[in-house]
A protein has these predicted regions:
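Short helix-capping segments at alpha-helix termini
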Residues: 17-22, 84, 110-114
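Short active-site-adjacent structural elements
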Residues: 35-37, 77, 90, 97-102
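Glycine-rich beta-alpha junction loops
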Residues: 3, 29-36, 93-96
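Conserved, mostly hydrophobic/aromatic
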Residues: 27, 89
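Short, hinge-like loop/turn segments at secondary-structure boundaries
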Residues: 16-17, 42-46, 107-109
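Catalytic-face loop-and-helix region of soluble metabolic enzyme cores
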Residues: 28-84
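Active-site-adjacent beta->alpha loops and helix N-cap segments on the catalytic face
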Residues: 2-20, 96-106
């Protein structure tokens, strides 16, 4: 479930639980680094992107500043939903890994240097 506000996610989960839904509800986060992309996602999904978020992003002339803002915004949002009891977070890359990696780095999540695709238990040979 894509969202832009931790309260929206928490409210959705609360309503779902009252309706008898017992499965995990994993919040989805799209890194906020490109206002045009966010508008397209809004048009496709009907999920409103806060105007203040779009305005803030549009105010940065350099993509590097948008990326920094998006990583900070994303990490705060992730911390908020995890604090609210989310079982995890789904990060949407839409074929752009860097913004997701920036969020993870800001949160202190780093790749395991010992991991390789060949050693992964789900790799088929």
């Amino acid at each position: 479930q894509l969202f832009w506000d931790a309260e929206v996610y928490a409210s959705f989960v609360e309503r779902a639980r009252r309706a008898g839904v017992t499965i995990p509800i994993v919040p989805g986060l799209l890194p906020a680094t490109d206002p045009a992309r966010l508008r397209r996602v809004q048009d496709l999904t009907g999920i409103e992107v806060p105007e203040q978020l779009l305005t803030t992003l549009a105010g940065f002339e350099e993509q590097e500043r948008r990326d920094e803002f998006g990583a900070a915004f994303g990490s705060r949002l992730i911390h908020s939903v995890l604090d609210a009891g989310a079982p995890g977070v789904h990060l949407y890359t839409f074929n752009k890994a860097k913004p997701v990696l920036d969020i993870l780095a800001l949160m202190g999540v780093t790749p395991d240097p010992q991991w390789s695709p060949a050693s992964h238990p789900f790799t088929h040979h």
